Design a protein with these regions (language model features):
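Juxtamembrane boundary at the C-terminal end of a transmembrane helix
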Residues: 150-158
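Structural signal for membrane-spanning alpha-helices in multi-pass inner-membrane proteins
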Residues: 23-26, 68-75, 99, 147-151
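Interfacial segments of alpha-helical transmembrane regions
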Residues: 2-17, 73-94
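Internal alpha-helical transmembrane segments of multi-pass membrane proteins, especially GPCRs
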Residues: 55, 86, 127, 134-137
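Hydrophobic residues within the alpha-helical transmembrane core of Major Facilitator Superfamily
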Residues: 17, 69, 93, 145-148
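Core segments of transmembrane alpha-helices
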Residues: 60-71, 137-145
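Interfacial loop at the N-terminal end of multi-pass membrane proteins
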Residues: 5-64, 105-127
Length: 158
């Protein structure tokens, strides 16, 4: 029979997957497109029908944070899981902070300043964004791996 600690952890893996999968999808599809030929490639974000994903992230990111909290509350007494949960949380927070502090503002800034910046500057900054995004993706995948380790760890209490 599944207990509440296990159920919270399964919910966390699901909620985290709703964060990780689109992040990876964007990295391999739309991110490569918008960074391919700035400023022309920025058109995918412009206009009435431009791509806007903020509404998705405003729902999914808090859901993952909430399930992290619930998982900590209900798994606190399970020593074999806590290390993995802390490691996953640290990477999740690092990815979220990097996204908030650099990735979103830089992308929005590039699009907004496209009329004033040279193609070379736009291209260099877009390529730097893509390069740094690889590290963000690795951190996201590692966090997922740590969550799977927590899920597979024994449910042995302190």
């Amino acid at each position: 029979m599944i207990n509440l600690a296990d159920l919270c952890l399964v919910g966390l893996v699901l909620a985290y997957s709703l964060n990780l999968a689109p992040m990876m999808f964007e990295s391999f599809t739309s991110d490569r497109i918008w960074a391919s030929n700035p400023p022309d490639s920025f058109h995918m974000f412009l206009g009435q029908y431009g791509q806007k994903t903020a509404h998705y992230w405003r729902v999914v990111s808090p859901l993952a944070a909430m399930t992290f909290i619930l998982s900590f509350i209900f798994n606190w007494h399970l020593v074999d899981r806590m290390f993995w949960l802390f490691a996953a949380l640290a990477l999740y927070v690092a990815v979220q902070l990097a996204t908030i502090a650099y990735f979103v503002p830089e992308q929005e800034g590039l699009i907004a300043s496209a009329p004033w910046l040279s193609r070379d500057v736009l291209q260099a900054r877009a390529q730097r964004w893509i390069l740094l995004n690889h590290f963000r993706n690795v951190a996201g995948l590692l966090a997922y791996g740590f969550l799977m380790c927590a899920l597979l760890a024994r449910s042995q209490a302190l």
